[in-house]
Amino acid sequence: MSTPANYTRVPLCEPEELPDDIQKENEYGTLDSPGHLYQVKSRHGKPLPEPVVDTPPYYISLLTYLNYLILIILGHVHDFLGMTFQKNKHLDLLEHDGLAPWFSNFESFYVRRIKMRIDDCFSRPTTGVPGRFIRCIDRISHNINEYFTYSGAVYPCMNLSSYNYLGFAQSKGQCTDAALESVDKYSIQSGGPRAQIGTTDLHIKAEKLVARFIGKEDALVFSMGYGTNANLFNAFLDKKCLVISDELNHTSIRTGVRLSGAAVRTFKHGDMVGLEKLIREQIVLGQPKTNRPWKKILICAEGLFSMEGTLCNLPKLVELKKKYKCYLFIDEAHSIGAMGPTGRGVCEIFGVDPKDVDILMGTFTKSFGAAGGYIAADQWIIDRLRLDLTTVSYSESMPAPVLAQTISSLQTISGEICPGQGTERLQRIAFNSRYLRLALQRLGFIVYGVADSPVIPLLLYCPSKMPAFSRMMLQRRIAVVVVAYPATPLIESRVRFCMSASLTKEDIDYLLRHVSEVGDKLNLKSNSGKSSYDGKRQRWDIEEVIRRTPEDCKDDKYFVN
């Protein structure tokens, strides 16, 4: 397929020239009232309640399936006509000159005929710091998103799309200063893998700081979060081992487990009864064919599930781990730094001793404004991983500026530098998350997740509403992320609001007014009232929501979970 003459690459944009005070405000909004803070409480000793999953009316589910059916029929008709009358435009799907097609017509159908129709809603180019506001680069397509051209326009949008939980995405401040100083001292790259010449004193300092913050004996840092999981399991699992994984675990965990060669069994998301039954069953059955006992059994779950906004039932997982002599792995990519009274993730939320979790994994991209990932565990496990992990021997180590950003953000959260700032950031994101979640529920939207989760999924269902919502919000200068199959179940398309401490209460009010307006136009307010405190009021007026919810969101009785 040839590239059209009018195709252009993403343009290079000049940095925005603004006074320092305005630039700072655009990246991290000033707290407008001490009343817009919330101190997260630990759930120590409290069981995790069963999540209340609201469902839409039957006609919405029916229309969603019908929507997909129409798209599939039209796509197959398009394919048939194209491969019959325009073969030169479909060479990658047809045999030609004795060559097999590059792609299977069936395997690529979803991407070509469904996703491409809404591709303008994904991977939108941006420039500048993704803080409170993000600068979006305007683009246009004249061929149903096959190619894009760029108008040159750049416009700021309120940022609900970035994993900037604590607002450390800033061009000025203690973290940026530390990163710039590290460039002068260490350059921008360490020059090799960790096992050779790639280890500096910054790596050692970061690992000690992470281990102390998490509450484990030692830690190991990596240059890529996805690669941390993808390469981890191969070091201590083989075909004689069993992994029992939550069905909604991240693809990086799935990739890593597959590469290890271990057997895999999945349990329904959050179903602890089903998990225990599966563990007992596998202990009895043992390995396939031989029925010998499994060499080791590893339970894998995420601390905070990024598509659902739900927490794992960590106390029950630890109980099952001890009862059946299994190992436990928890991925805290989205919970570490952003959740818990002091930002120490699900262990702190539930009052679980980190020593009861064998391996704690996390990333630096979400709460810390950096990049890379870490593994925290007992000393002997980390020592073994330093020898066996291929990423230690063959991958580039974390660059010094990224390490400096990570170290300074960790020190800010823990109060070692800039006392009080870390606490304020944690209390701001907690308030913002609870306020937006409760307000959306009161407006009538179906929202998933727990009260304090900074990930707030709002259900859209029909695939046609996904691009409509995204485009209408972009017109209102609000950047959001829409998500569909295969990242979610087929009929549960959603918009995922990523909350940040950088947003102010006025920002959320602005967001709520426009989400309510768009929700009315797209008929998205379809909850049944299950999420309301009294179970009676299913719809609130937007002005009443904005007036009453900031105080109500601080009271746990208004949240079913």
UniProtKB/Swiss-Prot annotation:
Organism in which the protein naturally occurs: Saccharomyces cerevisiae (strain ATCC 204508 / S288c) (Baker's yeast)
Pfam families in the record: Aminotran_1_2
Signal peptide bounds: none
Protein location: Cytoplasm; Endoplasmic reticulum; Membrane
Pathway(s) per entry: Lipid metabolism; sphingolipid metabolism
Record note on quaternary structure: LCB1 and LCB2 encode essential subunits of the enzyme and form a heterodimer. Component of the SPOTS complex, at least composed of LCB1/2 (LCB1 and/or LCB2), ORM1/2 (ORM1 and/or ORM2), SAC1 and TSC3. Interacts with LCB1 and TSC3.
Note: Present with 54500 molecules/cell in log phase SD medium.
One BP term from GO: intracellular sphingolipid homeostasis
EC class: transferase
Reactions mediated catalytically: L-serine + hexadecanoyl-CoA + H(+) = 3-oxosphinganine + CO2 + CoA
A GO CC term attached to the entry: membrane
Name of the featured protein: Serine palmitoyltransferase 2
